[in-house]
Amino acid sequence: IYGIFKRRKEKRRYNKAFDKYYEEMKSISLDSNILSEEEIADRLQYDTKKRPKPNELRIITQLLTEIKSVHEDDIHELNYQTIQTVFQITRFLERELQFGSKRAKIQALKLIQSINGYASEAVLVRFLYHREIELRNSARYTYMWLSQGDPFRFFDEDIGMKLRQWDMMELHAILEHRKKVGYNTPSFIKWVNTSAEENVKIFFINEIRLYNETDSAPI
């Protein structure tokens, strides 16, 4: 019974936030003009001086995810990011990673990719070698998504690193994202040569062909 009441309460909260913010958030995200934080806060009728509640921010990130999934090709990225600044989404995500449950941490890591959010490498680094496999992998993929340093070093450090089908899809999406935003992507040939896992070799061979690394592509 408690679970039913809890779900109903969460649904009411979601509906309230949806009615209050969704259409204006979508309009701002699709606006071709660059809008300031003040303009966006004013359009959303949001008081930036108040401390947003975690439950509210979880719903805001859900709305941002929905907007991104439907309108990804049309979104004005600067305005979309400024919405996140207005709601202090980065602060929320980093607090979830530092103090949240394991489930909350994994959700925050996935959200960073879903909404093209951000968390500092200093916060992420503690999870890159975590004993919990799901948390470790989620952190590594988010690190690959964000980092401009050496984000693929895990393939150098662990030649036995395995990739499931889902991992390959995730990694391909990360490579597409990095290409889109202009981040450096290393040559894949070294992992074709060094990996002990056949499916990892095949994955990177396919990526070489896709990215037209003709000098690196195996014959």
Language-model segment annotations:
Residues 100-101, 131-135, 162-167, 196-197:
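Short inter-helical turns and helix N-cap capping residues of alpha-solenoid HEAT/ARM repeat scaffolds
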Residues 37-107, 112, 149, 181:
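Membrane-proximal, non-transmembrane interface segments of integral membrane proteins
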